[in-house]
């Protein structure tokens, strides 16, 4: 994996309920103070940080003085609705000590599965990071229509890591990492420091569900690690109660279990773009062709001379020269109807023409794969 300087390195840190409560029935404020101290240190060093936080249901249960509720989805959603405000308020108060701003994102599966909403979430996350604001992400359990399954936030953290093109994902839990057998049952269990491939054997030793306060377990962390590493993101399962664990991980110390990347980000994106069906064709002028092939730049609306097909924002399209040669695949930031209106126009006029804008480019370089040079 290509190493980045701190000022460019993006890390997603997922905090399980057990890490935030430290074995108590409520958020452990003293421990969260220590967590925020480490994150503030890394933020000041130039790291780009994203928090994926559990703990809403535990916070809600404590705030309501541990009510006796039936074991239903509605009860879980009630606790999440009450606890989410308590959870985000705690994060906000602690980061304010260091004069660091946070921004809250509540996501559901629909936000990830719907391409338009997926792109909106990605744009919001990048906007926050670009303005040195730490995103705090959680599953929107209070309004989710599907059942709250085990490990949603583990999988969500992997998807968020993909959204922000992170270098690393830290899954902090109440375990030291992945062991060769269950350490709660076998005192001779040994920690596995590095996993280079997630095999059926690795999945089988991961075990089952987690604590009663949360919804996560080791097996879901393995699934999250699989998702992330296949997208070129190194993943580490580490003990959330270890002193200075986040800062030490960021600085390269070997802690917990590291899952090495299965492919680099570029190769992962290539595979996805190549596999996706083409929904349309953008024919570009010579200037745009040179910008893409020689200067490695994004495609601007001004360089588009013709549009074929009807497509949504984020669907894959071919980028074709006026000589009929396909030179790239890409995901446009605007749908075909919008591109018809802004093709050949200067980027500064996009908002005037459409009444809104998703940025100055038609296809960003990060959302493009060059086929031939």
UniProtKB/Swiss-Prot annotation:
Pathway: Amino-acid biosynthesis; L-proline biosynthesis; L-glutamate 5-semialdehyde from L-glutamate: step 1/2. Substrate binds at residues 54, 141, 153. It is found in: Cytoplasm. It comes from the Bacteria. The keyword Glycosyltransferase does not apply. ATP binds at residues 14, 173-174, 215-221. Residues 279-357 form the PUA domain. Belongs to the glutamate 5-kinase family. This is Glutamate 5-kinase. It comes from Mannheimia succiniciproducens (strain KCTC 0769BP / MBEL55E). The lineage of its organism: Bacteria, Pseudomonadati, Pseudomonadota, Gammaproteobacteria, Pasteurellales.
């Amino acid at each position: 994996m290509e190493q980045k300087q701190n000022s460019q390195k993006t890390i997603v840190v997922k905090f399980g309920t057990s890490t935030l409560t430290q074995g108590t029935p409520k958020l452990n404020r003293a421990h969260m103070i220590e967590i925020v101290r480490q994150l503030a240190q890394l933020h000041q060093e130039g790291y780009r940080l994203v928090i994926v936080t559990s703990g809403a249901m535990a916070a809600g249960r404590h705030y309501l003085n541990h009510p006796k509720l039936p074991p239903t989805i509605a009860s879980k959603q009630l606790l999440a609705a009450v606890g989410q405000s308590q959870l985000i308020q705690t994060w906000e108060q602690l980061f304010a000590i260091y004069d660091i701003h946070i921004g809250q994102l509540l996501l559901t599966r629909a936000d990830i599965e719907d391409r338009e909403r997926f792109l909106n979430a990605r744009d919001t996350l990048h906007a926050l990071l670009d303005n040195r604001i730490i995103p705090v992400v959680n599953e929107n359990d209070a309004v989710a229509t599907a059942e709250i399954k085990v490990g949603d936030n583990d999988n969500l953290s992997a998807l968020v890591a993909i959204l922000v093109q992170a270098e690393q994902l830290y899954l902090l839990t109440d375990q030291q990492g992945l062991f060769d057998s269950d350490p709660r049952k076998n005192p001779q269990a040994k920690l596995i420091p590095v996993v280079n491939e997630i095999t059926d054997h690795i999945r089988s030793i991961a075990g089952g569900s987690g604590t009663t306060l949360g919804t996560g377990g080791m097996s879901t962390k393995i699934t999250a690690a699989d998702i992330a590493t296949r997208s070129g993101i190194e993943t580490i399962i580490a003990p959330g109660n270890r002193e200075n664990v986040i800062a030490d991980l960021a600085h390269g110390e070997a802690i917990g279990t590291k899952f090495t990347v299965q492919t680099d980000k570029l190769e992962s994106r290539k595979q996805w773009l190549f596999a996706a069906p083409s929904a349309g064709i953008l024919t570009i002028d010579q200037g745009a062709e040179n910008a893409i092939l020689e200067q490695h730049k994004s495609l601007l609306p001004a360089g588009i001379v013709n549009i074929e097909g009807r497509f949504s924002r984020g669907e894959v399209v071919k980028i074709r020269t006026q000589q009929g040669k396909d030179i790239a695949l890409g995901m446009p930031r605007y749908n075909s109807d919008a591109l018809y209106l802004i093709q050949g126009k200067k980027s500064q006029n996009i908002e005037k023409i459409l009444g809104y804008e998703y940025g100055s480019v038609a296809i960003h370089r990060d959302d493009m794969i060059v086929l031939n040079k």
